[in-house]
Amino acid sequence: QLTIEENLHIAMRATGKPNPEAKNDVYDLFPALYALRRTRANTLSPDDQYQLALANALVNRPHLLILDEPLHGAGHSVAQKLVQLLGRLNRELGMTVLLAEQQLSFIRRVADRFCLLYRGRNVAQGHVNELDDELIAHWMSREAKR
C-alpha cells in the first residue's frame, strides 16, 4: 500500500547511497508520476504502474538497463513514450539498454544494433538496418519445421 514517493524512496535506498536528485530526474522523465506522487501504487492505472516500474529501475541511474519484452502488457500510449524514453536515456544520459523483444517495428525504432538468437545461439548480428524480413523469415521457418 505504498505511494509512488515511498516506492521510489525504497528503490533509492536499495543501493545504500541514495541521491535525492535522482528522484527529480525520474519525475522529469515521468511527469505524470510527479502529479500522482502521493497516490498509492495499487490504485494506479496499468499504464501508470508500468511507468512506476520503469521509474524504480531508473532512479539509481544505472549504466545498463535490461528490458525483457518491455511492450508486453503496455498500452499504446506507454509504448509510444517508451520509444521516446529509450532514445533519451541513451542520447542524454549515455545509458546502454539491452532489450529482448520480438516486435520488429519497435526494435527498428529504438535499437542501433541487434543480435538474433535461435535456440539460445547467436545466429545473426549487426546494425539494425541489416535486420530484414528475409532474415527473420529464414529463422522463423526453421522453427516452424521443428
Description of each model-found segment:
Residues L2-E21, F30-P31, G126, R142-E143:
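ABC-type ATPase nucleotide-binding domains, specifically the catalytic core motifs of the NBD
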Residues A57-L58:
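ABC ATPase C-loop
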Residues R61:
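Conserved catalytic motifs of ABC-family nucleotide-binding domains
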Residues L65-E69:
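Catalytic Walker B motif of ABC-type/P-loop ATPase nucleotide-binding domains
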Residues Q80-E92:
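Helical segment within the ABC ATPase nucleotide-binding domain
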Residues E101-Q102:
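H-loop/switch region of ABC-family ATPase nucleotide-binding domains
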Residues I107-R109:
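A short, surface-exposed alpha-helical micro-motif characterized by mixed small hydrophobic
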